[in-house]
Amino acid sequence: MAKPAVFLDRDGVINVDHGYVHDEHDFQFIEGVFEATAALQRMGYLLVLVTNQSGIARGKFSEERFISLTQWMDWNFADNGVEFDGIYYCPHHAEHGIGQYKEECDCRKPKPGMFLSARDFLNIDMANSVMVGDKAEDMMAAEAAGVGTKILVRTGKPITEQGEALATVVLDSIRDVPHYLLRVKK
């Protein structure tokens, strides 16, 4: 039986977006992220990370460095009782990529490739799933993948009119997501 998921962008949702974050010393968790994700898991949602990482494509850091940071991040969540069900990332950029990463792909948001891969692998009920992101591209990818609820948070990039128009709701941060979902899913 398909299960609903909460899809989470990384930079601006899980951590403060300092621009091309690739080192543990620059990785600052958003306040309340561990409590919020633990609550979402208790509510029965799968947790799936979906993140564009054009810093890899641009040569700002290696894919290995990203994977190492992601493992460190994942361990921090595990230490706080939270397990990700899936971690998906796009290392490509069609314009600014170099070498093998200069590619027009289906995984880079606003395209829905990461969402569809997660749906197929984890048997996700997309209509009852949620996207939490900080940009219009997050909302566009979620819409294209059939995600039912799209939440834009103010902890990342400035909210645009386009992002706000595509979102179901705009909240201050991920820490507000469980309370919102409990209110609307009653």
UniProtKB/Swiss-Prot annotation:
What EC number(s) does the entry state?
A: 3.1.3.82
Compartment(s) where it occurs, according to its Swiss-Prot or TrEMBL record: Cytoplasm
GO BP of this protein: ADP-L-glycero-beta-D-manno-heptose biosynthetic process; lipopolysaccharide core region biosynthetic process
- Which reaction does this enzyme catalyse, per its entry? D-glycero-beta-D-manno-heptose 1,7-bisphosphate + H2O = D-glycero-beta-D-manno-heptose 1-phosphate + phosphate
UniProt xrefs under CDD domains: HAD_HisB-N
Residue(s) at site: Stabilizes the phosphoryl group: 51, 109
Keywords, sorted A to Z: Carbohydrate metabolism, Cytoplasm, Hydrolase, Lipopolysaccharide biosynthesis, Magnesium, Metal-binding, Zinc
Molecular function (GO) terms for this protein are:
D-glycero-beta-D-manno-heptose 1,7-bisphosphate 7-phosphatase activity; magnesium ion binding; zinc ion binding
Q: What class of enzyme is it?
A: hydrolase
Q: Which cofactor does it need?
A: Mg(2+); Zn(2+)
Leader sequence residues: none
Q: In which pathway does it act?
A: Nucleotide-sugar biosynthesis; ADP-L-glycero-beta-D-manno-heptose biosynthesis; ADP-L-glycero-beta-D-manno-heptose from D-glycero-beta-D-manno-heptose 7-phosphate: step 2/4; Bacterial outer membrane biogenesis; LPS core biosynthesis
Q: Does the keyword Magnesium apply?
A: yes
Kindly list the positions annotated as binding Zn(2+): 90, 92, 105, 107
- Annotated catalytic residues: 9, 11
Instruction: Summarize where substrate binds, as residue positions.
Output: 9-11, 17-20, 51-54, 108-109, 135
- Entry's InterPro entries? HAD-like_sf, HAD-SF_hydro_IIIA, HAD_sf, Heptose_bisP_phosphatase, Histidinol-phos
Give residues annotated as binding Mg(2+): 9, 11, 134-135
Residues marked Contributes to substrate recognition (site): 108
Q: How does it assemble?
A: Monomer.
**What job does the chain carry out?**
Also catalyzes the dephosphorylation of D-glycero-alpha-D-manno-heptose-1,7-bisphosphate in vitro.
Q: Which PANTHER family match?
A: D-GLYCERO-BETA-D-MANNO-HEPTOSE-1,7-BISPHOSPHATE 7-PHOSPHATASE
**Name the record gives this protein:** D-glycero-beta-D-manno-heptose-1,7-bisphosphate 7-phosphatase
Q: Which organism is it from?
A: Vibrio cholerae serotype O1 (strain ATCC 39315 / El Tor Inaba N16961)
Q: What is the lineage of its organism?
A: Bacteria, Pseudomonadati, Pseudomonadota, Gammaproteobacteria, Vibrionales
Its gene name is gmhB
